[in-house]
Structures are given as structure tokens and as C-alpha cells.
């Protein structure tokens, strides 16, 4: 597990948490988003901080994209616009998300996150299941939206292209 971590994130930074498998990267993200996980030490976050989280797990996603947008209280037009930028065809808008590939499901979570008005975006393995072309599309979206981002990812190229700061644990 990780030990003696101290860092801050300024507005507009994209911070990559690096470490070996099992080093506590995902656990750290879960602590930051407020999950009740047994730990020692203190996690400080600004009061009224709004966080948008992209989980590693996409297995529970189902329903149409319109239903998903409504259930998550996000603007459907903006959501679908972002998905179009991630190479979704109009035919996919009518399909059940449970039938999407792992990469398509991850894109759904990323698009949802970018639709949320948050101070901090916390993404756990955003390029999991994502091919190179899709990774580049996500990089372009991050340049366009410029969110303050804390993320964990094992794709070194993505990390080099996106991160403005790296924290090794």
C-alpha cells in the first residue's frame, strides 16, 4: 500500500498517479472521491468540491444512451456530441449499452464525466479497453475541455501526452 503521499492539484492540471500494480493507486483515488476505506492518515479536499469519477468497471452499464443520460442527469445533446467525437455512429445511439464493447463502454463513462460540471475529474484507467485511435480522440477531448484531472493509467504514451504532473507512489 502507498505511504507518505502529499500532493496538491491546481486548477487546470492533469495529474497522473504512477505506481506498480497493487501499490494503492486506485485505492487512493477512491479515498479522494470519498469512499469509506480503512486507512491511516488524512485526505483533505476543498469544501464543496464537486468530483466526477470514471470507474475501471463498466460491467453494470445498460440501457440506451438516452436513458443513461437521463438517469445520470446530464445534457443528452452534449453527451451525444462528445460520443460523436469519440467515433460513435448514430446507429449506436439506439443500441443497448450492455451490447457495446469494453472500449465503447469506457467512452460512455468518459463522455458522461465530461458532461458533469465538476471541479475535479478523477479517472481510473481511462484507456482500459481503448485502441490507439480512440486514445488519441480522448487526448484531443482533454485538450478541448481542459478539465482538472487526477488519473491512473498504464498507457505510458497517454500519460506522457496528457499529464502536466506525475506523482509516483
Regions from the PLM with identified roles:
Residues 1-169:
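ABC ATP-binding cassette signature C-motif
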Amino acid at each position: 500500500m502507498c505511504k507518505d503521499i502529499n500532493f496538491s492539484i491546481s486548477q487546470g492540471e492533469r495529474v497522473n498517479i504512477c505506481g506498480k500494480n497493487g501499490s494503492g493507486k486506485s485505492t487512493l483515488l477512491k479515498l479522494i472521491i470519498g469512499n469509506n476505506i480503512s486507512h491511516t492518515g488524512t485526505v483533505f479536499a476543498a469544501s464543496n468540491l464537486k468530483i466526477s469519477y470514471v470507474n475501471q468497471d463498466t460491467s453494470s452499464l445498460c440501457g440506451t444512451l438516452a436513458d443513461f443520460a437521463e438517469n445520470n442527469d446530464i445534457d443528452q445533446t452534449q453527451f451525444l456530441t462528445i460520443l460523436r467525437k469519440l467515433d460513435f455512429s448514430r446507429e449506436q445511439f439506439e443500441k443497448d449499452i450492455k451490447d457495446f464493447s469494453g472500449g465503447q463502454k469506457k467512452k460512455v463513462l468518459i463522455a458522461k464525466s465530461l458532461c458533469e460540471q465538476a471541479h475535479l475529474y478523477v479517472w481510473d484507467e481511462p484507456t482500459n479497453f481503448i485502441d490507439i485511435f480512440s486514445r488519441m480522440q480522448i487526448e484531443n477531448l482533454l485538450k478541448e475541455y481542459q478539465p482538472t484531472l487526477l488519473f491512473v493509467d498504464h498507457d505510458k504514451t497517454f500519460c506522457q501526452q496528457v499529464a502536466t504532473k506525475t506523482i509516483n507512489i
